[in-house]
Amino acid sequence: MLLAVDIGNTNITAGLFLEDELICMWRMASNRAETWDEYGLQLIQLLERDGHTPADITCAAMASVVPPLNPVLSRAVQQYLKVQLKELTGDLRSLPAVRYDNPAALGTDRLVNALAGWEIYGRPQGRPVIVVDFGTATKLECVSAEGEYLGGVIAPGIRTAAEALTRRTALLQRVEIQRPKSVIGRNIAASMQSGILYGFAGLADGLVRRLTQEIAPDGPDPVVVATGGLASMVAVESRTIQMVDPHLTLQGIRLMYELNWPDAAAEA
């Protein structure tokens, strides 16, 4: 089986694949103070909790936006799971073409999202794809119907913006991010919740419409798929997001690994 690891700024998400099926998934905090030994023990505990052992894992791959954690997780996987954790980078095989000024500088989280979005949703329909990832940053990735990565947009993340709002103001306190009863807030908490939720739904819709004009001015409209921790909540209020795939990034890691190490992937 393949262990796919997504190292994000807030969380580390790991998933176990049997061929193309995600059979279990776990989350750990992205903690730069944590040692490889501590992460290794966590992985063992999570595996055992779901009825698996290190012997079940034959290969592993990671996409990371936190470089200091890369060697930590690599050693944890090597020492505790006895496999090499392959690091996915922008210069490896992915989409048919990458139209980015410096492909090596493209974050692999963005690249694997684009790859999965096209392979799973765009390619079967012969349509372009826009992937909206609601993470620590809000990222939109654009892929043509032919599988060309065209670039994208990076904006503040929902929680990032909400935390900045409370830090930079004297009277606004942190609120739970949830759907308010109405767009018009009748207290401070509801007003903030409305601004956060409907504001980001509007941000996503506005960007998707502008990107669509550039991607497909005359062709079929793109498939718009969202992922990330708050994607489901925002998608309900969005007029452009067509579907939510919470496992898109892990699927992209699997797909990119299979493209670059096909022999090892075939044995997973």
Curated annotation (Swiss-Prot):
Cofactor binding comment, as recorded: A monovalent cation. Ammonium or potassium.
Positions that bind ATP: D6, I7, G8, N9, T10, N11, I12, T13, T136
Annotated positions binding substrate: Y100, G107, T108, D109, R110
Molecular-function annotations in GO: ATP binding; metal ion binding; pantothenate kinase activity
GO CC terms of this entry: cytoplasm
Pathway participation: Cofactor biosynthesis; coenzyme A biosynthesis; CoA from (R)-pantothenate: step 1/5
Signal peptide: none
Catalytic activity entry: (R)-pantothenate + ATP = (R)-4'-phosphopantothenate + ADP + H(+)
Any single GO BP term: coenzyme A biosynthetic process
Enzyme kind, highest EC tier: transferase
The family this protein is said to belong to: Belongs to the type III pantothenate kinase family.
Subunit structure: Homodimer.
Name this polypeptide is given: Type III pantothenate kinase 1
Source organism per UniProt: Symbiobacterium thermophilum (strain DSM 24528 / JCM 14929 / IAM 14863 / T)
Lineage start: Bacteria, Bacillati, Bacillota, Clostridia, Eubacteriales
Gene: coaX1
